[in-house]
């Protein structure tokens, strides 16, 4: 093999390696860039959900419904962004990051289901069907408690791996 061939092979390997490094950096970088927006949407969704519950307890059904819809929109927005990040996972994506993203997706799916049940309960209470409204409210509460378990797992992952979460 000539020196010229060796140089060509070296350059090709260098280009492939550089491309892989850039791709991995961009995947992790895009995840780090998206996380503040995702976190803000989750916090806003939690706040809207809690406001919806307070408004429901005050029998302000229309306002409760509006807040619940806002919560659901915030949770869905975060979920869509996380699914996009998950679709771009590679075999080199850190297992802690994978676990974190999957945990937050599960948390959000439960929060979305809880919000859907809360919306159903609002409709039943508004129509004076309190027993059925109570059933949906209880289910919403159960789902939100399950979501909080995932939220605690997520928070522990961040606390245990501060170097991975900037």
Segments the model singles out, each with a brief description of its role:
Residues 1-4:
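Short, Lys/Arg-rich N-terminal segment immediately upstream of the first membrane anchor
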Residues 31-77, 113-166:
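C-terminal amphipathic alpha-helix
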Residues 74-106, 160-166:
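Short, solvent-exposed, charged loop/turn and helix-capping segments
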Residues 104-116:
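Extended, hydrophobic/aromatic-rich amphipathic alpha-helical segments that build helical scaffolds
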């Amino acid at each position: 093999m000539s020196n010229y061939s060796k140089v060509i092979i070296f350059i090709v390997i260098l280009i492939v390696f550089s491309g892989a490094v850039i791709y991995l950096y961009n995947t992790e970088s895009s995840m780090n860039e998206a996380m503040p927006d995702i976190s803000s949407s989750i916090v806003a969704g939690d706040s809207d959900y809690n406001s919806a519950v307070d408004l429901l307890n005050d029998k302000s059904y229309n306002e409760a419904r509006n807040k619940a819809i806002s919560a659901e929109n915030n949770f869905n927005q975060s979920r869509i962004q996380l699914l996009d990040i998950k679709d771009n996972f590679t075999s080199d994506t850190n297992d802690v990051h994978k676990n974190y993203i999957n945990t937050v997706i599960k948390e959000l799916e439960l929060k979305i289901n809880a919000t859907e049940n809360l919306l159903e309960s609002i409709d039943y209470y508004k129509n004076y069907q309190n027993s059925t409204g109570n059933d949906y409210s209880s289910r919403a509460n159960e789902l939100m408690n399950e979501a909080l378990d995932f939220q605690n797992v997520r928070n522990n992952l961040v606390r245990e791996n501060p170097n991975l979460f900037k």
